[in-house]
Structures are given as structure tokens and as C-alpha cells.
Amino acid sequence: MIKQDVSMKLVSSQSDGEQKESTELLSKAVYEKTLNGYKLTYDESEATGYNGSTTTIELFDGKKVVMSRTGSVISNLVVELGKKHHCVYGTPYGDLMVGVNANYIHSNLDDNGGKLDFKYVIDVNSSYIGDFDISIEVK
């Protein structure tokens, strides 16, 4: 499979234990098969708060998801089952070093698209920040 233009729907929800907030993004993206899985790349917009950035979400062997953001805001989050990763999370207000623990990763992505769902917890200096659920549909 070579790179192909696709439509994607990304639903993100986060909870800090008291409040839950959800956002939905519909966007065009570039989808491609890699040696170990699949990669999806899309441009952020004002709606996401990361205008001027490009985000890449890569699935490795169904067990690890790497979310990288480049451009006006730079981030690199690694969500891997059974491992805690310390990652740089860029925000419009500055960068944070965060701990990332995966709770769940499930994918039925194939050469025609599909769905990727993953859940993770973020902490800063071992203090709980929130639970994050991401669901991505590729068509």
C-alpha cells in the first residue's frame, strides 16, 4: 500500500476524575502502511488549538501507539501496553514532561482503513493529571 488520502474522525475524551470533556475532529489525512503497522498524518487547525502543527499517529504491532506533533507545538507521546514512558507534551503555553501509562490499545486497521482505540493515563511528577480515551476511524 502506498500513501493514500483518507477521511478520519478522531474523538478524544479526557477526565480528571471529576469532569469529563470530549472533542471530535473530522479531517483529511494521509494514511500509509509501515513495516510494523500503520501511520496517519494530519494538519491541526484552530479548532484543535494547535493551528500550524502536523500530527502523526503511528501504530506498532498493535501494542504501541506513538503520537508526534511538529510545527508550532512539538509533542511526542508513547502509549505502550506494559510500559511507562516519560514524554514531552507540548502545549500552546509551553512544554511538560509527562508520564504515560497505557490502559488499552485495540485496532482493526488494515490497508483499507478501520478503527484504532486507545486509553492512557498521564501524570506529572507522579501526580495524576487525567485519563485520556482516543478513538480514530479511518475511511
Predicted regions and their residues:
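N-terminal intrinsically disordered, cationic/polar leader segments
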Residues: M1-D117, V121-D123, S127-I129
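Flexible glycine-rich active-site/ligand-binding loops centered on an Asp-His dyad
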Residues: S135-K139
